[in-house]
């Protein structure tokens, strides 16, 4: 398992979030990816205890591509 920023599948960009709602959005989103929990950190959803097969922002070769 590992921690990291989960990404939007089509763009490889981080899921953005509201830091004033630290857990409300990110925790359920991270849990849907198999993480224990998650929270908003530096305006992105940071997930704790993700399965190793879930790609995270910063993995080798991962580039955020906006349209």
Swiss-Prot record:
<protein>
    <recommendedName>
        <fullName>Putative sodium channel alpha-toxin Acra5</fullName>
    </recommendedName>
</protein>
<dbReference type="InterPro" id="IPR044062">
    <property type="entry name" value="LCN-type_CS_alpha_beta_dom"/>
</dbReference>
<dbReference type="GO" id="GO:0019871">
    <property type="term" value="F:sodium channel inhibitor activity"/>
</dbReference>
<dbReference type="InterPro" id="IPR018218">
    <property type="entry name" value="Scorpion_toxinL"/>
</dbReference>
<feature type="propeptide" description="Removed by a carboxypeptidase">
    <location>
        <position position="67"/>
    </location>
</feature>
<keyword id="KW-0800">Toxin</keyword>
<keyword id="KW-0738">Voltage-gated sodium channel impairing toxin</keyword>
<dbReference type="InterPro" id="IPR003614">
    <property type="entry name" value="Scorpion_toxin-like"/>
</dbReference>
<feature type="domain" description="LCN-type CS-alpha/beta">
    <location>
        <begin position="2"/>
        <end position="65"/>
    </location>
</feature>
<keyword id="KW-0872">Ion channel impairing toxin</keyword>
<comment type="function">
    <text>Alpha toxins bind voltage-independently at site-3 of sodium channels (Nav) and inhibit the inactivation of the activated channels, thereby blocking neuronal transmission.</text>
</comment>
<feature type="disulfide bond">
    <location>
        <begin position="30"/>
        <end position="47"/>
    </location>
</feature>
<feature type="disulfide bond">
    <location>
        <begin position="17"/>
        <end position="40"/>
    </location>
</feature>
<comment type="similarity">
    <text>Belongs to the long (4 C-C) scorpion toxin superfamily. Sodium channel inhibitor family. Alpha subfamily.</text>
</comment>
<keyword id="KW-0964">Secreted</keyword>
<dbReference type="InterPro" id="IPR036574">
    <property type="entry name" value="Scorpion_toxin-like_sf"/>
</dbReference>
<keyword id="KW-1015">Disulfide bond</keyword>
<dbReference type="Pfam" id="PF00537">
    <property type="entry name" value="Toxin_3"/>
</dbReference>
<dbReference type="InterPro" id="IPR002061">
    <property type="entry name" value="Scorpion_toxinL/defensin"/>
</dbReference>
<keyword id="KW-0528">Neurotoxin</keyword>
<feature type="disulfide bond">
    <location>
        <begin position="26"/>
        <end position="45"/>
    </location>
</feature>
<dbReference type="GO" id="GO:0006952">
    <property type="term" value="P:defense response"/>
</dbReference>
<dbReference type="GO" id="GO:0090729">
    <property type="term" value="F:toxin activity"/>
</dbReference>
<feature type="disulfide bond">
    <location>
        <begin position="13"/>
        <end position="64"/>
    </location>
</feature>
<dbReference type="GO" id="GO:0005576">
    <property type="term" value="C:extracellular region"/>
</dbReference>
